[in-house]
């Protein structure tokens, strides 16, 4: 190859190597943009005038030089202890409150009318004349101090004794009229009238079903007292919360009366063989007490299963020929509604309605409150609810003890268990000045506890506070109720205040309850009648007070007017309650050590100081704050569960929730209100639960089903 034909290649290389474009990362986007422009050979455009830059000066970069003096200026995280609770904005109790619409009492109580107790024992009717056996009559008069029958007992006892072979019975009467003895006395008379030798092995003669554990326990107590006239008759109590093993042991020993709640009785029917053996040849009476509550609590299916088992038993008349030749069904209720009518059709056969003051062959509702009951109504704005309750309790505290009474008893009904816990703490836990008597559910106030304005420094308050709701253990509920209902040296001369849910509203015969306060409106008018029925029992006088909010709730008065033919007194929250309680006294602040000078202040100043004392207690005590928050949230949720017929009066949209939070001692509305909120009651983020696998879910559902079948409804 010649030189001319050779190929020449010309390569040009850069000795510095190939430069890659720098990538700018980190920092603010404006800083990255300016640096990118400088790397590209461009200067960032200055939009601000030079004069303005000079006036403002260059912004100093934040550089950590380790200087201790500069670090002092760095703000620290605020802890709960550093918060000055008195520097918060506190809303006034007496401003921005909604005015009440009811200016005139359309159903005014006439104090001049002569009152004849409608549920009192009759003066001219003895039990012996009604057909009750002489042994039982003697026991009633000498041991139980019961001399005369009531109106409902006068009608019911002869009917059951004479017509038990022919018909079932629906017993409808006012609360406190003596329905329990009305069906127990003829049953005892029929058993004792046989003349045969009877003992606990003779079989079960009566099955009595009650909706709540407390009512079942009370019926058991009354039955035990009656059975003391003949020691060979033995009752047995079957309720949730007790050990089934112990109940089975009692059933094996034998019993003549079985009293219990639906869930536990059905559980024994399904799992305890001896209970059917006890009833097979002897069962003659089945009683459903408080039928409306049985339906309301969802026991319809349970009752149906029990009735199927009972009705499948063969009645062997040759063993006890003097007893009815059939199983007699009795349904008792103080109210009549569609649900009770439904229960009566399913459980009663060819039944007879026994009612005082109405037609016996109709289901027309003629329910009314006892004539001797004095009903009062107070319309209080949301912010004034707590302070008004304090004023009402203070007014009761200042009243003298009724003649013949050992202690004053007041019941305050609330809508939910959390609200009960909160109000119990408000009125009993002031600075720890109390002593526990029964667990943490019964507290006697100590000297220096001035939770009510009329209590003086140098005197003992003379107050015992109780709390009762379905979340307490069965043993605690039983002991609390027993302590409240029993006259003893601990309760003598004192004011007993029971804060409770509707668990204590049905059937309980609590002695000498002078006042019932419905602080939260009832969920149904039937609950209203049963609540106020805890007072004015068996001919005794009593008072009931209903709290309502201004606005839509005032229409509730027209709704319940037909149940109060004697009318009511309409109270003004400020004039009739607060001024009487807080005028001409000195309510000291709980955050200052100031000795009382004897100087008195205006009533509104004292009321505000009292409420601020509660608020400061909540802010200083994290556990108390949690109770207040839970009480508020549960109250709001419970408020939304009123029955549809009463929604027009109790609509959550018409309630100022911020003002309502004030009545729970909260200066701010809790952040966590929804059931599915991502934050807890204190505003902290909730941790997401781990996803459950199929196997664990199956076992959890099985355990839940087993528990529901074994446990009683926790009401």
Swiss-Prot record:
Q: Where is the signal peptide?
A: none
Name where it's found: Nucleus, Nucleolus
Composition bias, Basic and acidic residues: 20-29, 40-73, 101-115, 682-695
Ordered alphabetically, the record's keywords are:
ATP-binding, Helicase, Hydrolase, Nucleotide-binding, Nucleus, Ribosome biogenesis, RNA-binding, rRNA processing
Binding-site list for ATP? 173-180
Q: Which reaction does it catalyse?
A: ATP + H2O = ADP + phosphate + H(+)
GO terms for cellular component: nucleolus
**EC number(s) of the enzyme?**
3.6.4.13
Question: Where do we find the motif DEAD box here?
Answer: 289-292
GO MF annotation list? ATP binding; ATP hydrolysis activity; RNA binding; RNA helicase activity
Q: Name all Helicase C-terminal domain ranges.
A: 400-586
Entry's InterPro entries?
Answer: DEAD/DEAH_box_helicase_dom, Helicase_ATP-bd, Helicase_C-like, P-loop_NTPase, SPB4-like_CTE
Q: Where is this region: Disordered?
A: 1-82, 94-121, 668-698
Residues forming the Helicase ATP-binding domain are 160-354
Note the PROSITE patterns from the entry: HELICASE_ATP_BIND_1, HELICASE_CTER, Q_MOTIF
Write down the PANTHER family for this protein, in alphabetical order: RNA HELICASE
- Misc remark for this entry? Present with 1460 molecules/cell in log phase SD medium.
- To which protein family does this belong? Belongs to the DEAD box helicase family. DDX31/DBP7 subfamily.
The record's domain comment reads:
The Q motif is unique to and characteristic of the DEAD box family of RNA helicases and controls ATP binding and hydrolysis.
Which protein are we looking at?
A: ATP-dependent RNA helicase DBP7
Q: Which organism is it from?
A: Candida glabrata (strain ATCC 2001 / BCRC 20586 / JCM 3761 / NBRC 0622 / NRRL Y-65 / CBS 138)
């Amino acid at each position: 190859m010649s030189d001319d034909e050779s190929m020449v290649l010309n390569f040009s290389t850069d000795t510095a190597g190939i430069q890659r474009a720098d990538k700018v990362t980190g920092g603010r986007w404006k800083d990255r943009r300016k640096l990118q422009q400088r790397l590209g050979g461009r200067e960032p455009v200055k939009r601000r005038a030079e004069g303005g830059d000079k006036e403002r000066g260059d912004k100093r970069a934040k550089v950590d030089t380790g200087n201790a003096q500069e670090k002092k200026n760095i703000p620290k995280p605020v802890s709960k202890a550093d918060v000055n609770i008195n520097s918060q904005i506190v809303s006034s109790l007496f401003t921005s409150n909604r005015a009440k619409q009811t200016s005139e009492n359309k159903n005014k109580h006439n104090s001049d009318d002569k009152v004849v107790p409608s549920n009192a024992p009759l003066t001219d009717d003895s039990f012996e004349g009604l057909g009750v056996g002489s042994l039982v009559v003697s026991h009633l008069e000498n041991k139980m101090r019961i001399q005369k029958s009531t109106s409902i007992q006068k009608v019911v006892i002869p009917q059951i004794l004479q017509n038990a072979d022919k018909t079932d019975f629906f017993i409808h009467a006012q609360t406190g009229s003596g329905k329990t003895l009305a069906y127990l006395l003829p049953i005892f008379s029929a058993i004792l009238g046989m003349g045969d030798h009877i003992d606990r092995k003779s079989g079960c003669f009566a099955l009595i079903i009650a909706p709540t554990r407390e009512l079942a326990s009370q019926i058991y107590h009354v039955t035990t007292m009656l059975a003391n006239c003949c020691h060979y008759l033995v009752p047995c109590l079957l309720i949730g919360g007790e050990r089934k093993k112990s109940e089975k042991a009692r059933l094996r020993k034998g019993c003549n009366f079985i009293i219990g709640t639906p869930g536990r009785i059905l559980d024994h029917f399904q799992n305890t063989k001896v209970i059917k053996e006890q009833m097979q040849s002897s069962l003659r009476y089945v009683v459903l007490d408080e039928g409306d509550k049985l339906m309301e609590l969802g026991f319809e299916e349970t009752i149906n299963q029990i009735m199927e088992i009972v009705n499948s038993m063969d009645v062997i008349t040759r063993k006890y020929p003097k007893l009815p030749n059939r199983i007699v069904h009795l349904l008792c209720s103080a109210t009549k509604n569609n649900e009770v009518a439904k229960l009566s059709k399913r459980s009663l056969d060819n039944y007879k309605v026994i009612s005082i003051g109405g037609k016996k062959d109709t289901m027309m509702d003629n329910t009314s409150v006892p004539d001797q009951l004095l009903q009062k109504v107070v319309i209080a704005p949301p912010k004034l609810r707590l302070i008004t309750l304090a004023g009402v309790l203070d007014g009761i505290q200042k009243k003298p003890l009724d003649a013949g009474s050992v202690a004053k008893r007041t019941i305050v009904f609330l809508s939910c268990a959390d609200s009960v816990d909160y109000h119990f703490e408000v009125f009993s836990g002031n600075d720890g000045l109390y002593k526990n008597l029964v667990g943490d559910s019964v507290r006697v106030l100590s000297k220096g506890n001035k939770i009510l304005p009329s209590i003086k420094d140098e005197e003992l308050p003379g107050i015992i506070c109780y709390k009762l709701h379905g979340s307490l253990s069965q043993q605690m509920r039983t002991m609390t109720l027993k302590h409240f209902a029993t006259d003893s040296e601990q309760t003598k001369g004192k004011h007993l205040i029971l804060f409770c849910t509707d668990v204590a509203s049905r059937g309980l015969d609590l002695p000498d309850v002078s006042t019932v306060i419905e602080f939260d409106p009832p969920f149904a008018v039937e609950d209203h009648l049963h609540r106020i029925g805890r007072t004015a029992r068996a001919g005794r006088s009593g008072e009931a007070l209903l709290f309502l909010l201004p606005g839509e709730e005032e229409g509730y008065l027209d709704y319940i007017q037909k149940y109060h033919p004697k009318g009511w007194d309409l109270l003004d929250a400020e004039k009739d309650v607060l001024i009487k309680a807080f005028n001409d006294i000195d309510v000291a602040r709980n955050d200052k050590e100031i000795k009382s000078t004897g100087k008195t202040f205006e009533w509104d100043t004292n009321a505000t100081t009292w409420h601020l004392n509660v608020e400061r207690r909540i802010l200083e005590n994290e556990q108390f704050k949690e109770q207040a928050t839970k009480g508020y949230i549960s109250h709001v949720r419970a408020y939304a569960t009123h029955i549809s017929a009463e929604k027009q009066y109790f609509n959550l949209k018409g309630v100022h929730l911020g003002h309502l939070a004030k009545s729970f001692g909260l200066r701010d509305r809790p952040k966590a209100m929804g059931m599915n909120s991502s934050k807890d009651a204190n505003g902290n983020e909730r941790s997401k639960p781990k996803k459950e696998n199929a196997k664990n879910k199956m076992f959890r559902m099985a355990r839940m089903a087993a528990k529901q079948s074994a446990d009683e409804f926790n009401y």
